[in-house]
Amino acid sequence: MTNPTKPIPLNFDKPRRFMPPKHFADLSADERIDALKELGLPKFRANQIARHYYGRLEADPSTMTDLPAAAREKVKDALFPQLMQPVRAVQADDGETQKTLWKLHDGTLLESVLMRYPNRATLCISSQAGCGMACPFCATGQGGLDRNLSTGEIVDQVRAASATMQAEGGRLSNIVFMGMGEPLANYKRVVSAVRQITAPVPEGFGISQRNVTVSTVGLAPAIRKLADEDLSVTLAVSLHTPDDELRNTLVPTNNRWEVAEVLDAARYYADRSGRRVSIEYALIRDVNDQGWRADMLGKKLHKALGPLVHVNLIPLNPTPGSKWDASPMDRQKEFVQRVIAQGVTCTVRDTRGQEIAAACGQLAAEER
C-alpha cells in the first residue's frame, strides 16, 4: 500500500484503458432487437436469448440449442464477447467465502467475493477496476483507478456467481456493491446493472431490490440522483468519522462534499426510498475510535436521519504497508454502546475473508 503520508490524487473521470466490446447486457431491449435484426434474426429471439442469459445463466450462445445452429455463431460473435476470464479463486471460512480474480479483455484485473451463509448467499461485486477515491486506509483506493467497468462486466459478475450457486443447488440472494471502485462514480452503468439484477426473468436475474446494497464514499449529488431513480435498494455511506477535519484525510472526497451535505443527501435518499440508510465506519485504533467521536456520530446521525439509519462498525482489515490497525475489542464495545446511547442502532459487522484479503478495503486485484 502507498504510504498514507503521501496521498494520491482523487480520480473521477480519467480511466487509462479502453472499454470492452458491446455485450448483450450492455444493450437496452430495443437495441437488442435492432442488433438481432442486423443479423437477420426476428425480434422474438431477443427474449429467447435473455431467458438463457438471465434465467439459465448461460453466457455461451453455442449452448442455446433452441436458436438455429447457423445463428448461434453470429449471436456469439456480435453480442457475447468474452468479458472476463477467471485467473484464480481462493477460499476461506471453511470454503464458505470465495474470492475470484478476473482478467478482463484488456488485461485489467478485478475481484469479486462470494459469501455463503446458512440462509442466503451474498456477492460483493466491483463497479470499477481499481478506485479513484484515494482513501488512505483502503488497498483498492491506494492502488488507483484503471477504468470504469461496463454494464456487461458488472452484470456478468452476478451471472457467474449465480451459476456457481445454481450448480451447488443454491441461489444467489444478495448483492452488495462493495467491491472495487466507487459505484456512484460509474453512475449510469451501475444503475443499469442494478435494474438488470433486480428485474424479473427474462429482463434480469430477479433478485429483490431490498437485497441489493449500493455503497458510496459520499458523492452527495449522485446520492440525490439515485434517490430520484425510484429504486428501493439499500444505500450504504462510508462515513468513517463524523468530523470534517479527520474525514478530509480519511475520505478525500470530503473536501468536496462535507459530512453535513452527505448526511442531507442520505436523508433525501431515505425519504424518497423509504429505506434505512447504512453508515459504514471502519474502526481504526487511536484514529477514529475515540468515545467523543462515537457520541458525535450518534448525535449527528440521529439529528439527520432519525430512525432511518443503522451503523455498521468494521474493525479495520489489515492491508500491506499500512501503518494503521483495528481498534481493540473493548474499544469496539464502548463505541457501540455510545452510539446506541444517542438513539442510533449500531452493530459490529461480521468480517469474512480477511485471511485471503477478501474483506472490506483489502481488494487489490493482484496477480500473485
Curated annotation (Swiss-Prot):
Its cofactor is [4Fe-4S] cluster. Keywords: 4Fe-4S, Cytoplasm, Disulfide bond, Iron, Iron-sulfur, Metal-binding, Methyltransferase, rRNA processing, S-adenosyl-L-methionine, Transferase, tRNA processing. The keyword NADP does not apply. GO terms for biological process: rRNA base methylation; tRNA methylation. Pfam families: Radical_SAM. It is found in: Cytoplasm. Residues 117-355 form the Radical SAM core domain. Disulfide bonds join 124-360. GO terms for molecular function: 4 iron, 4 sulfur cluster binding; metal ion binding; rRNA (adenine(2503)-C2-)-methyltransferase activity; rRNA binding; tRNA (adenine(37)-C2)-methyltransferase activity; tRNA binding. Belongs to the radical SAM superfamily. RlmN family. This is Probable dual-specificity RNA methyltransferase RlmN. It comes from Corynebacterium diphtheriae (strain ATCC 700971 / NCTC 13129 / Biotype gravis).
